[in-house]
Amino acid sequence: MRTLWIMAVLLLGVEGNLFQFEKLIKKMTGKSGMLWYSAYGCYCGWGGQGRPKDATDRCCFVHDCCYGKVTGCNPKMDIYTYSVENGNIVCGGTNPCKKQICECDRAAAICFRDNLKTYDSKTYWKYPKKNCKEESEPC
């Protein structure tokens, strides 16, 4: 619970990418990104290690890898341009770096939506990082 409170406080002042990512997750899944994905498995939330535990956790692994490939801007803070057209997220703007951040977030939000049935809160919500010791696979 303390972790959620800290994250909520941190997000209050955020107007950049993490806030936008939360909106995209909500739009695609109907779920709160902070409440559903901030402390799930080995990769959802801050940092990540080991092997993804299920398809939902793999969405976070792929998202982390995607952010790792972004250069020239800050994936967690920079604001990007997007719209939602007929239920689809469309990344816009002319800045290629910010567009890449948007595409990372878009892909993750869609992945969460497509894998809602794999979400296992009883097993993987607040999953102890000490159980994420397997060797990580490459991005």
Curated annotation (Swiss-Prot):
<keyword id="KW-0564">Palmitate</keyword>
<dbReference type="InterPro" id="IPR016090">
    <property type="entry name" value="PLipase_A2_dom"/>
</dbReference>
<feature type="active site">
    <location>
        <position position="105"/>
    </location>
</feature>
<protein>
    <recommendedName>
        <fullName>Basic phospholipase A2 APL-D49</fullName>
        <ecNumber>3.1.1.4</ecNumber>
    </recommendedName>
</protein>
<dbReference type="Pfam" id="PF00068">
    <property type="entry name" value="Phospholip_A2_1"/>
</dbReference>
<dbReference type="GO" id="GO:0006644">
    <property type="term" value="P:phospholipid metabolic process"/>
</dbReference>
<feature type="disulfide bond">
    <location>
        <begin position="91"/>
        <end position="102"/>
    </location>
</feature>
<dbReference type="InterPro" id="IPR033113">
    <property type="entry name" value="PLipase_A2_His_AS"/>
</dbReference>
<keyword id="KW-0449">Lipoprotein</keyword>
<keyword id="KW-0106">Calcium</keyword>
<keyword id="KW-0378">Hydrolase</keyword>
<feature type="binding site">
    <location>
        <position position="43"/>
    </location>
    <ligand>
        <name>Ca(2+)</name>
    </ligand>
</feature>
<dbReference type="GO" id="GO:0050482">
    <property type="term" value="P:arachidonate secretion"/>
</dbReference>
<dbReference type="GO" id="GO:0005543">
    <property type="term" value="F:phospholipid binding"/>
</dbReference>
<dbReference type="GO" id="GO:0042130">
    <property type="term" value="P:negative regulation of T cell proliferation"/>
</dbReference>
<feature type="binding site">
    <location>
        <position position="45"/>
    </location>
    <ligand>
        <name>Ca(2+)</name>
    </ligand>
</feature>
<feature type="lipid moiety-binding region" description="N6-palmitoyl lysine">
    <location>
        <position position="26"/>
    </location>
</feature>
<feature type="disulfide bond">
    <location>
        <begin position="42"/>
        <end position="139"/>
    </location>
</feature>
<keyword id="KW-0479">Metal-binding</keyword>
<comment type="similarity">
    <text>Belongs to the phospholipase A2 family. Group II subfamily. D49 sub-subfamily.</text>
</comment>
<feature type="active site">
    <location>
        <position position="63"/>
    </location>
</feature>
<dbReference type="GO" id="GO:0047498">
    <property type="term" value="F:calcium-dependent phospholipase A2 activity"/>
</dbReference>
<feature type="disulfide bond">
    <location>
        <begin position="65"/>
        <end position="139"/>
    </location>
</feature>
<feature type="disulfide bond">
    <location>
        <begin position="66"/>
        <end position="104"/>
    </location>
</feature>
<keyword id="KW-0732">Signal</keyword>
<feature type="disulfide bond">
    <location>
        <begin position="59"/>
        <end position="111"/>
    </location>
</feature>
<dbReference type="GO" id="GO:0005576">
    <property type="term" value="C:extracellular region"/>
</dbReference>
<dbReference type="InterPro" id="IPR001211">
    <property type="entry name" value="PLipase_A2"/>
</dbReference>
<feature type="disulfide bond">
    <location>
        <begin position="73"/>
        <end position="97"/>
    </location>
</feature>
<comment type="function">
    <text>Snake venom phospholipase A2 (PLA2) that does not show antibacterial activity. PLA2 catalyzes the calcium-dependent hydrolysis of the 2-acyl groups in 3-sn-phosphoglycerides.</text>
</comment>
<dbReference type="InterPro" id="IPR036444">
    <property type="entry name" value="PLipase_A2_dom_sf"/>
</dbReference>
<keyword id="KW-0443">Lipid metabolism</keyword>
<dbReference type="GO" id="GO:0005509">
    <property type="term" value="F:calcium ion binding"/>
</dbReference>
<feature type="binding site">
    <location>
        <position position="47"/>
    </location>
    <ligand>
        <name>Ca(2+)</name>
    </ligand>
</feature>
<comment type="subunit">
    <text>Monomer or homodimer.</text>
</comment>
<keyword id="KW-1015">Disulfide bond</keyword>
<feature type="signal peptide">
    <location>
        <begin position="1"/>
        <end position="16"/>
    </location>
</feature>
<feature type="disulfide bond">
    <location>
        <begin position="44"/>
        <end position="60"/>
    </location>
</feature>
<feature type="binding site">
    <location>
        <position position="64"/>
    </location>
    <ligand>
        <name>Ca(2+)</name>
    </ligand>
</feature>
<keyword id="KW-0442">Lipid degradation</keyword>
<dbReference type="InterPro" id="IPR033112">
    <property type="entry name" value="PLipase_A2_Asp_AS"/>
</dbReference>
<keyword id="KW-0964">Secreted</keyword>
